Every structure is written in structure tokens, then in C-alpha cells.
Amino acid sequence: MSTNDDLKTKFVRSVDDRNSLSNVGARWTKRELGRFESDDHRGTTLVVIGGVHGNEPAGLIAAMRVLDTLNAEEPTGFHGQLVVLGGNLPALNSDDENARYIDFDLNRIFTDEQIAMPEDTSVEHGQMQELLAALRSIRAQSERMIVMDLHTTSSDAPPVAVFEDSIMAREFARQMPLPIYLGFEEELDGLVIDRVTNELGSVAIVVEGGQHNDPQSIVVHEAVIWAGLHASGILPIGSLIGSFAHETMPGDVLRKAVGDQAYKVFDIRHRYAIEHDDFVICPGIVAGKKIKQEVTPIAVENGQEIVSPVRGRVFLPNMQETKRVGDDGFFIVRHIDEGWLGFSARLRKQEWIHRIIAHLPGVYRIDDAGHGSLYVDRDIAGVLKRQVFHLFGYRLIRHDQHDGGHGVVRAWNGMTSFCKAFFRGPIPGGPDENDPRFWIVRRHHLDRIDRIDRADR
């Protein structure tokens, strides 16, 4: 068993003080801040990442508390590894307590193009390379890796789980009583969890644990880590009943924090990117508020009211002290019936359905080494809508807000769009990859891995 004891000693020990963000005196100087492992540590590894944004240290504080408990109790039921990694160390160590990042948002640059750039391109490019190297090394040494990226929010909102919607990720996340938000990766490029999922083939989820400076966010994140250890099969939670950390069961902590939102599922429908640093969320706009399409003012930017092109609920309204052009202004989400997920899981496993989809008029396979990507005529895509692609397990890589209508109008538009594509005939050689008339969709990577694994059994 091992951990970085020198870092642990920098945390105050009294229960009251441990709940306070302001009492943490540690300087985050190491990429790997600690680990706890059993003798058979080549099994499952749970990686906890905290501080990807400098003003969000709660996840790291919670992770160090978990390591403290594990080292104090040395539970015999522990099989595997828990590894804690720091995210944006310079931003975490900044004298500006509101510093989210130094040059670039670290959680937006894990793309192929940015990874290919020199480490000295920016502070965050160097941090990205170090963090990615650590994750690759851990994955190479583990039979199975699961990553939990812990964050907090600028607005007052209940804890939530966010991940790419694969069946494997669902099975892991739904063992925790958190509301689930799907489709983030379709609106944001360069997420840490997106790189982990699609390069390293591992389940990866983001957990937003509460508001930045709320001490309860530490308690929530600690409960999330214990629940993650249990869900991954590394440590049955019953092994720690009676310890000071488990006077309240982790699941009960999370249920209390989320209230009636437990296990509810939402789909992200729109992201507004800030275009001017004079951006303010309107009074009364809070996470979860219902808004009307093109009606409800959500923010004021450079003197102009901002409304949403879609209806739904507000998610993650930006209340940061400092805002930069390109930052997330807000998201709009809609609730999904839980029965939809079960139906979706059954459909995704039917390979004949995917073969039919690929041969529909206006749909073209993309030669991408078996990743299951398709070009889809935007008129047809607008009729099918993103929720239908999600149902069959496709992620939107390139899309727009084109809407094929509702009810009878949608049925008519669908019929005419398919007829046009049918009589037009296939495009020789397929569409140009930059043709905006076509959406690009791709099957979820972990669903394809799961299919291959099942076929090999």
C-alpha cells in the first residue's frame, strides 16, 4: 500500500476543518498525488482527476480524504488500484483563487490537433501532455481503467454525472443516484473524458459536485469516489461501514444532495458560446429553469438579450467571476424518459439495424477504419433529429440546428426528403467531407468495443 504522505500531512485533521475549502494549505506540486493498491493491482484501476480547472480543488481534497481513510483502515476487501491525478497544477497554485486556467481551458484542448502541438505552446498544453502521459501509462498497466473527472460549478446546482452515452458507461454511472446528462461531447471539443473514452477505450465520467466554494461539494465528491470504488468492483462499500467517513452511506449523501433528481436522465440540446466578455446571466435564470424557444431571455451580452433556439431547461449557466470569449455561456437540456435507455440498449446490439441505416437514401458510409461513421443528408437528419441517432447509439460529430418539424409536418418532410435522396441517387465517391449539407454521425466507441468483445467470447 502506498501514497504521498508528505502531501497528506498538509491537510488539517479535525472534521470541522476538513470541510472547509479555505483551510487547505497544500500546494499541488505532483501530477500523481497519491495511490492505494492491493497486491493484485493489475486488475481494475479507478483514476480520480481533480483540479482540471484551477478554481475547482474540491475533487482533489475529497480524493485525499479517501486515501487517508484507506491508509488508516487498509480494508482487506480492496482489490485493484485507486490513483489520484492533479489536473491544471499552475492554475490550482495560482494566487488568483478565481483562476480557472492560465492560457487555455485545459478541458477543451484534448483534441488530435492540440495534442500534436509543442508542449511550450501554452501552460495548458504542457499540462495536457503530462496528464495524458500519466493516463496512458496507467491504462497500459491495468486490465481495466475507469476515470472519474471531478468538477464544481459557478452556479448553485445539484451534483450531476456527465459522460459519452455508451452502454458500459451507463451501467457504471447508474450505480450512483445522480442525475445523468448526455451529449456533452457533441457540443464541446477536447474534453478529458472524451480522449480517455475514444483513445484509451475506458469508461470516463465527469461529476459536477456542487458549487465552487461550498464545503458540501467536498463531501459529495468523497461520496462519489466511494461509490465509484464500489461500482467498479474494487471495494464493496460494506467493507468500510463504521469508519468515520461512513457514518452516512455514500448513496444516502448523494440522494440528499440531488433530491428528486436522482437517476433522472437529460440530453444536451444546445450550447451557447460566449462571444463578448461583457456577458451576464439574467436575474432569475438558474440551473433547471424551464425556458421557451426564442422567447425567454437567458443572458445579456454586450447589451443584447440572448435567447435559446430550442426549448428546454437551463444547465450550467456561467456565473464565473471572469469570463472569456469562447467559454460556455449556458446549455439547454431536455428530460429523457428512462424507458428510452432500455429500448436504446436493445436496439444498439442489433447489427442488422446498423447495416440498414448505412444503406438508407442520403446516408453514406465513411472509410474510417471501422469506427462506424456516416454522412447523413441534413434534410433527412433534421427529420430524424438527434434523439433518433442517440437511440441507435450514434454520436453527432458535425451537425447544426436544422429541424425537420413536428407531427404531420415532420412526417411529410421525412417522406419528401427520403424521396428526393432516393431519386437523386447516390453521389459518386460519396459526399465531400467538408460539404455542410451533410451531418456526420459515428457509433459510440465503447459500444463498438463491447460488440467486438461479445463476438470474441
Language model features by range: what are they?
Residues 1-457:
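Structured catalytic-domain cores with a bias toward divalent-metal coordination
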